[in-house]
């Protein structure tokens, strides 16, 4: 293939072949990776010439660089011009010429008008978000917005004309086109190819087609075109290979298709000037701006390995970075700037202080990608996709020391930058430094404004001239032309002193910077105008991200809410009165005003403050500068007062600011107590402050003028480097690369300057060490970057989907629509600006610097090895041949699977698995015996089965670990990973044989490493003895014994004893354990019939009703269902007995406790009262005949017990007769008092009976009084003290001291009371208690 493409075709320029090749590449958007948007427009214009001869002629001049562009601007006609043009068409043509000339002469006027209108219309556009704006205002806003867009359109056209006019631009484009075409040929010729065909098949097809076409055409042409034919065919061929560079292109056009969306250019636009140069007349219009598109930076990065970086650009970049850091230091510390020479000689310690004092950005913001214009057919510039490298943000300033430590030791971390970024983002601050409880909306507004200012300041390619105020030395008449000067540092100072109360005030100051530059530098070719236009477009991109918020004072807002509530209450009362009178409600003017103010309170907040202090309006007008009088009419007078106060307090270290905040808070509290008094205090305070501000403002202006004069002395040469020409402006790859790597190149250059001191090498400087993780090939680093980018985009997509599921998407979309209402006609999706997260993947600049490519200066090796893709194709071919031939030979790794100790170890593992399985069955039966598990299994049987399935592991040694190792392309003997896999498998089997059911992978890996080290030591020791040069060299047996001894094995008998115990005795022991467990399991599952009882069947079982228990256990048809044919009808015998029925409560303690638990509890039986059985009921035969003998026996027992208890009593006859009475009730079981039998004497452990008894202490003894109890009983036998009887008689629970009542000693209701006890009974004393 390569031989058919002669390189000699590129030794001459064949314009016709290169033109066709360029058209084909252009149709496939191949040049988007190499050319800027302006260059693409000119190339598209050049390829759209209608005449082929003129096109080829212009192309020939273009390739030789002998061409110039004459650019003219054309504008669309207004409505009035169209109306006049309809009457007289001849005037139409002249109007275009006049308009172009007018714009050429009056460029400054248009520029100034565009910026001023931009500032005014920005307010109107933002106010469109409110729904309460009248229709008349909308018409005015639309007209003014159209005027502003028209002015911006004219400004963009002028800038485009300045860029592409002349010979320099077209010459750079010609050189770039030749470079791209020749580079494609070199890449194709020197691309490695093999027999498996890495290139696309379409290359051969396209080549054959082009060759045939060129051969047919060449028959009628001269032989001199043959080289062009072959060359063109070759060009067409390698072009298809380069299609991979542009993967994002969706449309693939035909080869012969002309460039799209272009009007044909007539030959009258081509002229030859006096210098023999071809002049191409190009007309640019609004449609031309729509063709300017954004480049794909990620694809452009893929070609950065062809950029050779030297330090020639780093000096300017370093100076710009140092100037930015010095500006930050001046803002933070209020010190004067140092001279440029001092900055270049700064020490490392001072650089660190500057870095620490430099405010960081919180969010990565998009920047232009090497192109000034980034809009696609709209007036507004389009947002770019490039993410510049920024720090973690202003939210993480408290982590700056941690971040610096991490950066220093970044090489020691084992995680990627992507993981480190998300790890740090988890600990970021939750509360911003802009948070204020008194000023509502300040945090959101100031955070967004700070991001915009810092991003503009960090855009050092164009922002350096606008960092500080204009020096009086450089522009003496500047302040005579510009009434109000503004710069980025002043904006940042005003932001930090809380002088902005709305977005519009901030936007006005930002846009005023570029307006002043364009107004003062009226020359269209002035270099600062390009910087101003670029910064203006950058500002328009970033301003969209600022929410439209007006800061409100909490006290004022609460007061307005209270007034609104009062008005609502008054309206309700009025409606009630009107409804009572039968009339319709009247529209009161005062009430309607309050209602309208409530609706648009956020918009017209400043007007409410104006009404509170109307007397200050006249006094404040003299304080407002002239530049501020042109601001929006809705700006309040109080806002101006606060701005002036804060201007005077910038240099006072924040002390007065805190005092003002305290005063404001105190006034807010007073206003909440008394509204009228607070209003007067506020008016007086504002008047006092106004008078003070007049004096302080004059003093501060004098101080600022003195500071400016001092700064001018140090800044004489500060702007000189800005006059340097940018030779890479038309080179897309270089410009984007310089923008992305600006910061890191400046840091590297600063560190390299430390190597030298006083013109000599500095031996004390620290070496600039490279990051080992970044010292990879460019392709690997770029692939890692793309993977991290894809992961980040996927993570954001998942988060966005989760937000939409939670219902927050509607709110976010509504907010975006309100803030981007004036960008509805923009082709860019409005949500992109707000979907930017601060934790996006950051671009590491160092990976794209060739200093990290250690092999960039070393020539490549001739043989680079086998490519991975090629190896895969070779293996695929080998596998296909094996499948076709049916070769299925056994792997060489499975030759010893049935030899050695492998079968014995597998047998032990199998026995252990079987024992575990039996134990699992036993534990499952035990678990089913508990009622709780039975209920769970019935409620969810599937989950119960899934959770208690035993996972049986089967060892299959016939499986090959690495079947691919059989291929001839694999070196299995020296494959470390394959050897590790086999060792890992053997160690796992050893662990299983020793009882480990499961193990953590890290533990097995550790054992594998230990085993590998041990075997390696054995081999090393044996190799050392075997290769020794000693004269006392032993035999092979002696060397083996010595090797084992040195590695911990005393003698070979230890190995034999290990094998005998591990694979002999252990196997027998495992078999014995298995047999015993199997017999125990059979005993559990097959209980004897003699052990069956009613306790074995639960209440929910139907075995007694169906006879199923007999048929399952003995095979007997107990009820004869099988003979009657009712087995299928009832379905009681077809199903097996549940396992719960057979296994629950068979001679287990759990079963007994379960039966006891089903007894009637005491609390259940206490409320039940049973009627006592009397003798009369027994005689009458009121009971079941079966129970009568038992009751008669109980009666005799009760009779004997009563007689025995009453023997010692004086009235024996009475007791005997009472038992014969029909009302005598049988005694209950608990009424029989059983005598305790004397316990046998227990012998101590010594076996001897001890005669010494332990005496009880006298303090715990109770001594009875010496009284004659028998005399007391005889004296008053019918009297006793019984609290219980007294309580029962009175029916009251409380006890009182009463007269004792006579009781029947033989009363069976209280037969065993203390009064019925005889002399043999124990003594008891029951005394009444007095009620407290």
Curated annotation (Swiss-Prot):
One of its GO terms (molecular function) is structural molecule activity. The keyword Transcription applies. GO terms for biological process: chromatin organization; conjugation with cellular fusion; protein-containing complex assembly; regulation of transcription by RNA polymerase II. Residues 217-233, 250-260, 593-634, 644-697 have a biased composition (Basic and acidic residues). Protease PEP4 directly cleaves the C-terminus of SPT7(SAGA) to form SPT7(SLIK) within the SAGA complex in the nucleus. Residues 362-376, 1316-1332 have a biased composition (Polar residues). One of its GO terms (cellular component) is mitochondrion. Present with 2360 molecules/cell in log phase SD medium. This is SAGA complex subunit SPT7. It comes from Saccharomyces cerevisiae (strain ATCC 204508 / S288c).
């Amino acid at each position: 293939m390569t031989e058919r493409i002669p390189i000699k075709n590129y030794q001459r320029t064949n314009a016709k072949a290169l033109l066709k090749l360029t058209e084909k590449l252009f149709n496939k958007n191949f040049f988007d990776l190499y050319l800027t948007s302006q260059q693409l427009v000119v190339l598209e214009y050049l390829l759209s010439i209608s005449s082929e001869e003129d096109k080829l002629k212009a192309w020939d001049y273009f390739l030789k660089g002998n061409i110039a562009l004459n650019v003219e601007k054309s504008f669309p006609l207004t409505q009035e011009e169209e109306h006049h043009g309809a009457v007289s068409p001849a005037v139409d043509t002249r109007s275009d010429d006049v308009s172009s000339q007018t714009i050429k002469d009056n460029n400054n006027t248009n520029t100034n008008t565009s910026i001023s209108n931009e500032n005014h219309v920005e307010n109107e556009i933002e106010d469109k978000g409110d729904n309460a704006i009248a229709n008349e205002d909308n018409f005015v806003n639309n007209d003014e917005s159209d005027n502003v867009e028209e002015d911006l359109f004219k400004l963009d056209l002028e800038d485009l004309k300045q860029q592409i006019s002349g010979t320099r631009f077209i010459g750079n484009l010609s050189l770039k086109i030749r470079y791209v075409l020749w580079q494609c040929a070199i890449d194709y010729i020197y691309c490695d190819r093999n027999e498996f065909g890495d290139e696309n098949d379409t290359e051969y097809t396209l080549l054959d087609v082009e060759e045939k076409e060129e051969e047919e055409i060449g028959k009628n042409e001269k032989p001199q075109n043959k080289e062009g034919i072959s060359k063109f065919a070759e060009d067409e061929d390698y072009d298809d290979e380069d299609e991979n560079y542009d993967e994002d292109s969706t449309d693939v056009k035909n080869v012969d298709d002309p460039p799209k969306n272009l009007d044909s250019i007539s030959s009258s636009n081509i002229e030859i000037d006096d210098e023999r140069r071809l002049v191409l007349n190009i007309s640019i219009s609004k449609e031309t701006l729509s063709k300017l598109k954004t480049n794909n930076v990620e694809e452009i990065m893929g070609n950065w390995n062809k950029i050779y970086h030297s330090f020639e650009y780093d000096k300017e970049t370093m100076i710009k970075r140092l100037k930015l850091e010095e500006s930050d230091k001046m803002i933070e510390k209020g010190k004067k700037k140092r001279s440029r020479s001092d900055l270049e000689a700064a020490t490392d310690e001072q650089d660190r202080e500057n870095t620490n004092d430099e405010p960081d950005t919180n969010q990565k913001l998009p920047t232009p990608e090497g192109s000034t214009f980034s809009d696609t057919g709209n007036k507004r510039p389009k947002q770019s996709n490039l993410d510049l490298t920024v720090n973690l943000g202003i939210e993480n300033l408290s982590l700056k020391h941690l971040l610096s430590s991490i950066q220093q030791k970044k090489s020691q971390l084992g995680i990627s930058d992507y993981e480190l970024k998300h790890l740090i983002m988890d600990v970021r601050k939750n509360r911003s430094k802009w948070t204020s409880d008194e000023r509502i909306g300040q945090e959101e507004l100031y955070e967004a404004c700070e991001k915009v200012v810092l991003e503009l300041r960090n855009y050092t390619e164009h922002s350096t001239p606008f960092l500080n105020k204009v020096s009086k030395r450089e522009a003496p008449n500047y302040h005579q032309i510009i009434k109000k000067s503004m710069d980025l540092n002043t904006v940042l100072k005003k932001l930090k002193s809380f002088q902005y109360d709305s977005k519009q005030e901030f936007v006005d100051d930002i846009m005023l910077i570029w307006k002043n530059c364009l107004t003062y530098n009226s020359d269209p070719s002035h270099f600062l105008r390009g910087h101003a236009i670029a910064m203006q477009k950058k500002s328009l991109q970033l301003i969209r991200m600022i929410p439209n918020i007006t800061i409100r004072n909490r006290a004022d807002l609460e007061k307005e809410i209270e007034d609104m509530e009062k008005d609502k209450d008054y309206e309700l009362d009025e409606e009630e009165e009107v409804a009572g009178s039968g009339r319709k409600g009247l529209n009161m003017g005062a009430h309607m005003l309050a209602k309208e103010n409530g609706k648009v309170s956020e918009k017209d907040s400043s007007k409410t403050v104006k009404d509170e202090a109307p007397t200050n309006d006249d006094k404040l007008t003299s304080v407002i500068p002239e530049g501020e009088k042109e601001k929006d009419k809705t700006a309040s007078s109080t806002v101006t007062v606060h701005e002036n106060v804060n201007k005077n307090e910038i240099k006072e270290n924040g002390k007065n600011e805190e005092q003002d905040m305290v005063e404001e808070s105190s006034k807010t509290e007073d206003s909440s107590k008394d509204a009228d008094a607070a209003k007067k205090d506020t008016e007086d305070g504002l008047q006092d402050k106004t008078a003070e501000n007049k004096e302080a403002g004059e003093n501060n202006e004098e101080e600022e003028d003195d500071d400016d004069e001092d700064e001018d002395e140090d800044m004489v040469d500060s702007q000189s480097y800005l006059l340097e020409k940018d030779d890479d402006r038309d080179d897309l790859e270089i410009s984007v690369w310089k923008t992305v790597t600006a910061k890191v190149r400046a840091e590297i250059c600063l560190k390299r300057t430390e190597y030298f001191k006083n013109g000599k090498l500095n031996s004390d400087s620290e070496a600039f060490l490279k990051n080992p993780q970044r010292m990879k090939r460019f392709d690997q680093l770029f692939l890692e970057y793309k993977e991290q980018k894809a992961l980040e985009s996927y993570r954001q997509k998942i988060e966005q989907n989760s937000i939409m599921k939670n219902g927050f998407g509607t709110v976010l979309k509504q907010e975006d629509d309100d803030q981007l209402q004036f960008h509805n006609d923009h082709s860019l999706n409005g949500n992109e600006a707000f979907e930017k997260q601060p934790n996006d993947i950051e671009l590491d600049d160092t990976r794209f610097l060739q200093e990290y490519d250690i092999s960039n200066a070393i020539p490549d090796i001739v043989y680079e090895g086998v490519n991975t893709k090629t190896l895969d194709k070779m293996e695929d071919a080998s596998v296909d041949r094996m499948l076709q031939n049916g070769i299925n030979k056994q792997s060489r790794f499975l030759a010893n699977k049935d030899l050695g100790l492998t079968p014995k170890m597998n047998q032990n593992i199998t026995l252990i698995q079987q024992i575990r399985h039996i134990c699992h069955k036993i534990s499952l039966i035990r678990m089913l015996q508990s009622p709780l598990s039975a209920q769970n299994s019935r409620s969810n049987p599937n989950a119960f089965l899934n959770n208690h399935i035993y996972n049986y592991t089967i060892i299959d040694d016939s499986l090959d670990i690495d079947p691919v190792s059989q291929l001839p392309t694999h070196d299995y003997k020296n494959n470390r990973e394959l050897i590790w896999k086999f060792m890992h498998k053997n160690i796992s089997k050893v662990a299983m044989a020793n009882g480990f059911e499961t193990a953590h992978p890290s533990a097995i890996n550790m054992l594998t490493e230990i085993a590998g080290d041990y075997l390696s030591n054995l081999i090393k020791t044996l190799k050392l003895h075997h290769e020794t040069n000693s004269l006392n060299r032993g035999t092979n047996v002696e060397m083996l014994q010595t090797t084992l001894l040195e590695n911990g094995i005393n003698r070979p008998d230890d190995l034999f004893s290990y094998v005998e115990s591990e694979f002999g005795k252990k196997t027998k022991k495992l078999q014995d354990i298995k047999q015993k467990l199997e017999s125990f399991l059979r005993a559990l599952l097959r209980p004897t019939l003699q052990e069956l009882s009613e306790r074995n069947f639960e209440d929910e079982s139907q075995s007694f009703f169906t006879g199923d228990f007999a048929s399952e256990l003995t095979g007997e048809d107990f009820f004869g269902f099988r003979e009657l044919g009712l087995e299928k009808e009832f379905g009681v015998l077809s199903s097996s007995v549940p396992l719960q029925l057979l296994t629950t409560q068979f001679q287990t303690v759990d079963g007994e406790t379960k039966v006891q638990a089903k007894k009637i509890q005491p609390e259940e039986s206490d409320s039940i009262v049973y009627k006592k059985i009397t003798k009369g009921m027994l005689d009458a035969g009121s009971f079941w005949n079966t129970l009568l003998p038992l009751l008669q026996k109980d009666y005799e027992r009760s009779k004997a017990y009563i007689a025995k208890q009453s023997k010692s009593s004086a009235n024996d006859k009475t007791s005997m007769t009472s038992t014969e009475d029909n009302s005598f009730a049988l005694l209950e079981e608990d009424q029989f008092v059983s005598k305790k039998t004397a316990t046998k004497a227990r012998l101590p452990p010594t076996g001897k009976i001890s005669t010494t008894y332990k005496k009880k202490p006298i303090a715990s003894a109770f001594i009875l009084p010496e009284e004659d109890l028998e005399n007391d009983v005889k004296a008053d036998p019918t009297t006793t003290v019984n609290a219980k009887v007294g309580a029962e008689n009175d029916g009251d629970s409380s006890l009182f001291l009463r007269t004792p009542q006579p009781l029947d000693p033989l009363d069976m209701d209280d037969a065993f009371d203390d009064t019925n006890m005889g002399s043999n009974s124990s003594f008891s004393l029951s005394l009444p208690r007095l009620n407290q």
